[in-house]
Amino acid sequence: MTEQVNLGGAWRMREADSQTWHSAHVPGSVYADLMADGTMPDPFWRENELDAFERMKKDYVYQRTFTVTEAQLAHAHVELVCEGLDTLAHVSLNGREIAFADNMHITWVWDVKEQLHAGENTLEIRFDSPILYCAKKAEEAPGWESSDATPGFRHLRKAHCMFGWDWGPRLPDAGIWRPIFLRTWDTARLENALMLQAHHDGVVDVTIRPEIAGESAWSAEITAPDGEVLTLPETTAAEQVIAIQNPQLWWPNGLGKQPLYRVTVRLATGDTRVWRIGLRTMTVSREKDEWGEEFCHVVNGMKVFAMGADYIPEDNILARVTPERTRHLLEDCKAANFNAIRVWGGGYYPDDAFYDICDELGLMVWQDLMYACAFYDLTPDFERSIRVETHQNVARLRHHASLALICGNNEMEMFMAGANSALINHRTWEFVPTYPHHITDYVKMFEYILPAIVKETAPQTYWWPASPSSGGNFDAPNDENRGDNHYWDVWHGEKPFTEYRKFFFRYASEFGFQSFPCLKSVEQFTLPDDRNIFSRVMERHQRNQAANGKILSYLSQTFRYPNSFDDLLYASQLMQAEAIRYGVEHWRRNRGRCMGAIIWQLNDIWPVASWASIDYYGRWKALHYAAKRFFAPVMISAEEEGELSQNPKINEYHPAPLEKSFRLNVCNETLRDVTGEVVWALRTPDGEIVRQNQQTLTIPAMSAKWLDKVDCADASLTGHYVSFAFVVDNVAVSEGTCIFCAPKHFEFIDPRLTVETHGDTIIVTSHAYAKQVWLESEDADLLLDDNAFDMNPGTKVVRVVRGSAEKVRGRSVWDLGR
């Protein structure tokens, strides 16, 4: 039977060239330990990042003692298991170096029986400076990599974004970042198990194939969500099959429940492991069609429109990431009607808790392997390392119901093919000559080695070579009509929001727009004098080149200029929400042709101006509230024609009269037909109805339905707006508004917003049309069931989800510039 001795907890740590020891905690990191004992201030405060970066130009030593008994040494196998060493680690036992680790993403295992003795033993791990290592490698073997990061990062199997990104600081921490322990066993050890599913009418056959080090008989059982237990007898066979009658199927969020079955495998020698699985089929359809080739998730035979965002590491200081914090973030995804999440390839493979929570919440996981924005040298050592890394991580993740596909890398095929020159030009990538071996190495890695490992390790998990891609082999990897797409002409290309409507991507896996965090968040990393977007500290917390200028450029196109720093932050969030709304609503209206909208990005790694919908401190931006509406299972939206779509620069000559019209569409991303009333009204700024209409509409399951275009030639360009809603059983399940000009030119009148609070209920009253009403507490954090919403004259009831409703104030677009 396998036994473990935990080696985590209290350690000590020092700079390699110093004899001054600091107390340390494992799992943890150098930065976390230096902050804990007061040696280093928080690197997220103001410009402290610079000092923290300099500290990582040194080597660090971790040390602890532990006791081993004669009984433990009597086992046939005594192993040191390190589930995460970050990254260049020399491991010594009792004064003798026994191993060197150089991959953060690997679980390292060494047999140490001969190096241990009964009594007290000393374990020491020395971490080489990742900065100095990468600098040396960058000189020795140059090659293309993201210029936002420290040069040479591509040579090290370490989370790339720790070296900096266009949303993250340069804080390449080091340390023992995951559990470390001694493991003893004798004749057999249960390493893992492969579970395969075969679905038939009313039955799912589950094949269980244990992976055993050594030899042992084994048995298994499956416990259903209702407690029913199905057993498999003890056997020495390689696999057994168990039939589950009347299976409870796992569905993505919004389409059904997420029942999980518990699989227990036991060895006769005593080892036992438990996994949770969901019964479902999950693949990707690439059927040819009239537009090219579709790309969509297919779950239990149903084609699903993916709605979600791209996930990056939650913190540069990895010790701060906890299962509770991750659950909070992912529950906020479900609250915003996500059914999917993409784990971006420039970070690290998340902990098991991440995938467990996605299983529970119904979030389909697009899992990148950890390669991003760089060309790699496939040396023999590198190949050996990535083979182990890929097998280990895929084997760890493969049983999860939420695992939708495994993708080879982020943006490497696109950059190597030069498929998107607009993106490259606007991103300020600094290209170096592409060496021929980089192309051949890429093909070997992502079209032969890695897909073969994934197929062998997780034969029922879909493989996709890169993001974006049309299927590999450098065949137009950002093609609008095939595969997945990264679209950045809105933002990097500074195109207007309406530009999204020109494209019908089969699956948009990246598109985004920046905003600043709210004032409460800015106050947590700045001094009062820093609170100007062009201050040194605010620019330090803005890592995308020229981004603040882009925000102001878009602001000039959209709103009146704000009168305060707080209003500027607010305006940036409103623009972000509007930009992404334009894209998502357009693609959902074209369901069938378009089958995925994954927003860049969900979260922040530190306090920063970025594309995130939830900031570093967990506060929802306006975008996340908007996502809750435009990702709603049943959603009404308008494709309006007006000045923004035809003549956004009002002084340019436009020979034809501007079309003023709108066309409504209702999307139904549920497994049942939905019948309701579509109601709309053309209104003046005070809410007075000029004309209106109502009609009954049935939208079939998993579809989108257009209504006829409504001509508004008689409407005032700047003095009329349209309100619309889809009403089911007298409840407006989705609603919105549209105008025919930029908000800055609309003839808003003071809505005279009033806010009343009654416990966890907030009643908002508006006396005129109010656009993007924002409610916030002056003192406390506040999460609401709706925010940044449009209002006709009247009242709206908003519920408090988290926080206190005391001292709540409201504002809207009317307040900007006044």
Residue ranges and their predicted role:
Residues 1-340, 589-590, 594, 619, ...:
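Secreted/periplasmic carbohydrate-active enzymes, especially glycoside hydrolases
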Residues 104, 166-169, 251-252, 310-323, ...:
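The substrate-binding groove and active-site-proximal loops of carbohydrate-active enzymes
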Residues 304, 334-341, 359-364, 399-405, ...:
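Loop/turn elements at helix/coil->beta-strand transitions in domains of secreted/extracellular proteins
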Residues 340-386, 477-494:
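Aromatic-lined substrate-binding rim segments of carbohydrate-active enzymes
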Residues 360, 377-472:
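Active-site neighborhood of glycoside hydrolase catalytic domains
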